[in-house]
Amino acid sequence: MANLGCWMLFLFVATWSDLGLCKKRPKPGGWNTGGSRYPGQGSPGGNRYPPQGGGWGQPHGGGWGQPHGGGWGQPHGGGWGQPHGGGWGQGGGTHSQWNKPSKPKTNMKHVAGAAAAGAVVGGLGGYMLGSAMSRPLIHFGNDYEDRYYRENMYRYPNQVYYRPVDQYNNQNNFVHDCVNITIKQHTVTTTTKGENFTETDVKMMERVVEQMCITQYEKESQAYYQRGSSMVLFSSPPVILLISFLIFLIVG
């Protein structure tokens, strides 16, 4: 890790040092810096054009037929058909704004979808609701239960409730807590709708939810370790020195 940081520091120093020097070099003069050829600017060779006020028929420097510097047919500098500088069909005030675009409406389906996965569920003491999963194909050892599961699997949960993995000592504790809270919440919600579960249903739900909780644990553990690795990388001294040097080049 230290060697990688040193090589990164060397490459960025070599690249940004040239950029830092370029920023401090004086810039040469622009186009026609030796003097202006237009009136009133004192070029060495004299002006090639006489002092100009307005154009033809311009008493105050406006365009053709412009008494006060507006566009064609504009007495006071507004757009076409604008007597006092407003937009088309506007008298310069805040009224007549029928052409103003309306504000976009918030799509509530998108808001609900964003809050569905990984959101903290209110009233459950810090539990989060995982993303929807495909129900696993499980064999229960006999044809009757296998057929019963295939016919009723849609009645079982496809999402699990869980807490962050750093609150548990091992996978077993995470899975045990995940199974209990998920089955409890699903049973209460379904019973409220007038549907009851048999002992066979509860047995199958335990197997299904256990598999989904294991999958959720593996997913959360991987994300947790990736976040930890990123923190270790950015907290190493070579990377801190590199970031400080880049900030110095940008600000300086």
Curated annotation (Swiss-Prot):
- Look up and give the membrane topology term: Lipid-anchor; GPI-anchor
**Region of interest (5 X 8 AA tandem repeats of P-H-G-G-G-W-G-Q), ranges:** 51-90
Which Gene Ontology terms cover its molecular function?
Answer: copper ion binding
Q: Which SUPFAM superfamilies match?
A: Prion-like
Residue positions assigned to the propeptide: 230-252
What does this protein's UniProt record list under function? Its primary physiological function is unclear. May play a role in neuronal development and synaptic plasticity. May be required for neuronal myelin sheath maintenance. May promote myelin homeostasis through acting as an agonist for ADGRG6 receptor. May play a role in iron uptake and iron homeostasis. Soluble oligomers are toxic to cultured neuroblastoma cells and induce apoptosis (in vitro). Association with GPC1 (via its heparan sulfate chains) targets PRNP to lipid rafts. Also provides Cu(2+) or Zn(2+) for the ascorbate-mediated GPC1 deaminase degradation of its heparan sulfate side chains.
**How does the record comment on the protein's domains?**
The normal, monomeric form has a mainly alpha-helical structure. The disease-associated, protease-resistant form forms amyloid fibrils containing a cross-beta spine, formed by a steric zipper of superposed beta-strands. Disease mutations may favor intermolecular contacts via short beta strands, and may thereby trigger oligomerization.
Q: What is this protein called?
A: Major prion protein
Q: Which gene encodes it?
A: PRNP
